[in-house]
Regions:
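Tryptophan-centric aromatic hotspots in well-structured domains and transmembrane helices
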Residues: 29-30, 98, 102, 141-142
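Short, basic, alpha-helical segments at the C-terminal edge of helix-turn-helix-like DNA-binding modules
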Residues: 41-47
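Amphipathic alpha-helical packing segments from all-alpha helical-bundle domains
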Residues: 75, 79-82, 92-119
Length: 174
């Protein structure tokens, strides 16, 4: 339904009608549309491929960019995130869940990638984890909101280049 209608047009009533259950059944599990969609996003993020060692910082950053783009800028993400972010921002409990799951899990994954790069001698430390995550997510959201027609492959390359720039003191690959 989300892919068909998008986040803004999705309603609890519509979900109940389509699934053949009472609206109260849905509200017993989720207090709002945003919570219901958040759980769907958690499920979707579980289906993303793991961040395996690609053998280089550049390869690992490309893998991170691919995951972020798949989640946020894939067909479903483009239909969810623009409306979801606004609703979530007005719900402190949901924002806390978002921070404690997607944000912290992402930060832990990025830390592991940067630790591998330190072991390979490509980076001196892992201090840029929070900055890197902010650039990755912020850039993808900005591009999804303001460049909605951008091809996923081009977006992934842009995000990987921005990530490399963060870690290399602002220099982008030639």
């Amino acid at each position: 339904m989300l892919e068909e209608l998008g986040y803004q047009a999705l309603t609890i009533e519509g979900v109940a009608a389509r699934s053949g259950v009472a609206k109260t059944s849905i509200y017993r599990r989720w207090q709002s549309k945003a919570e219901m969609v958040f759980d769907l996003m958690l499920h979707s993020s579980d289906e993303l491929p793991p961040l395996e060692d690609r053998g280089s910082l550049s390869g690992d950053l490309d893998a991170i960019a691919a995951r972020v783009v798949a989640l946020v800028a894939g067909p479903l993400g483009r239909r969810i995130f623009p409306g979801f972010i606004g609703d979530a921002a007005g719900d402190p409990a949901l924002m806390e869940r978002l921070r404690n799951t997607i944000v912290l899990d992402g930060r832990n994954q990025i830390t592991r990638v940067l630790e591998r790069s330190v072991r390979r001698g490509e980076l001196a430390d892992t201090e840029a984890v929070a900055d890197l995550q902010a650039v990755l997510i912020g850039a993808v959201l900005m591009l999804v909101l303001f460049e909605p027609e951008m091809d996923e492959g081009l977006l992934r390359n842009k995000i990987a280049d921005l990530a490399m720039a963060v870690l290399s003191g602002g220099r982008t690959p030639s």
